[in-house]
């Protein structure tokens, strides 16, 4: 648990600092997640760890820090299935949205994380389109073109539904399971 929590906090720090600013709303989103999934003690520990990560990031420079991020992603990917990695990335997307907008540097950081976690880059576009309710967005959620056949639509739906099914991430805590349920519902609506 501790190594996962540390790796998770390293990734969260990467997203929070990606735009060059530490926003209160992003930190509060992280704290709420820690509180719900790990308890109040983890919030205090998380704040201390994040502060140390920010300090280390300043001292070591971008290239060295990105190597730590890569290593953390590889460690997480080695111990989690793809559905769990998707939910982790989904939470980091929520952190990036917490201040009301996603900076281009945050988007690049999220793309890096998706790649380093072994996820297809299209999953990010799908995550950003889940909350939209038009036909074009529905195709983007499913990762297919508007010219797709019915069979292609059905296959894409089955793939997404399987990846985001709440039962696949139940071991990661209630908050993650609820987020997966929300995504699963949005996929059904698409």
What are these model-predicted stretches?
Residues 1-17, 21-190:
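Small-residue-enriched hydrophobic alpha-helices in membranes
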């Amino acid at each position: 648990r501790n190594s996962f929590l540390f790796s998770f906090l390293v990734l969260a720090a990467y997203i929070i600092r990606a735009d060059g600013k530490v926003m209160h709303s992003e930190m509060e989103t992280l704290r709420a997640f820690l509180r719900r999934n790990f308890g109040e003690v983890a919030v205090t520990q998380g704040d201390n760890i994040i502060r140390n990560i920010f300090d280390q990031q300043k001292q070591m420079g971008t290239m060295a820090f990105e190597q730590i991020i890569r290593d953390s992603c590889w460690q997480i990917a080695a111990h989690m299935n793809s559905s769990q990695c998707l939910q982790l990335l989904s939470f980091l997307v929520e952190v990036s949205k917490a201040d009301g907008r996603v900076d281009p540097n945050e988007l690049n950081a999220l793309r890096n994380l998706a790649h380093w976690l072994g996820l297809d880059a299209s999953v990010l576009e799908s995550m950003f389109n889940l909350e939209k309710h038009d036909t074009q967005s529905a195709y983007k959620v499913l990762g297919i073109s508007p010219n797709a056949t019915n069979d292609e639509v059905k296959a894409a739906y089955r793939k997404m539904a399987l990846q985001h099914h709440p039962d696949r991430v139940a071991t990661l805590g209630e908050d993650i399971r609820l987020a997966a349920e929300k995504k699963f519902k949005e996929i059904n609506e698409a």
